[in-house]
Amino acid sequence: MNSRKLFSKLKEESYDVSIFDLMNAKVYLEKDMTYLPEDYKKGYLEDFFTFFPEVLREIKNKTEEEIEDFEIDEEEIKKVDLRLCSMGSKKMGRNSYEKLVKTVINYLIFINKRPLHALTTRFPGGKQIIEKNGNYYCPIKNAQSNELSICEFCICKDLNEL
């Protein structure tokens, strides 16, 4: 698939994500994170619901002409979408969460080539993604052995490579 074609599709999808979807997605994620430590959960939710709406705005404000023209393996897009659909529980708000995440994550992976988490996100142990000389380094990149993880698609390198 052509990058501009994918971007055009994602831009169209970005307009389908409403304020109600954002609210439902937040309720969904809060419930899905019930058993995580409160301070970690609070920080993650703040970062997520600052970062993802910012990326949605970015998608809406860009034009197709601003997107570099290149080919993207459609099988990779399908793999990402399948993983995103498999993550988390099937609680109320799931559809809103999926709509938001599929649009933003596909944009970050295939079009914008940026980390999938905000640079301010604190991971267990208090570590964050580090940007150095145009490269991103993640403290959990190689720690994710879950077959449903989408880390393998993220542009970040492992923090140990720094």
UniProtKB/Swiss-Prot annotation:
Q: What is this protein called?
A: UPF0305 protein MmarC7_1691
Question: In the record, which residues are listed under signal peptide?
Answer: none
Top-level division of the source organism's lineage: Archaea
Q: Between which residues do disulfide bridges form?
A: none
Name the Pfam families on file: DUF2115 (PF09888)
Which protein family is it in? Belongs to the UPF0305 family.
InterPro entries attached to this UniProt entry = DUF2115
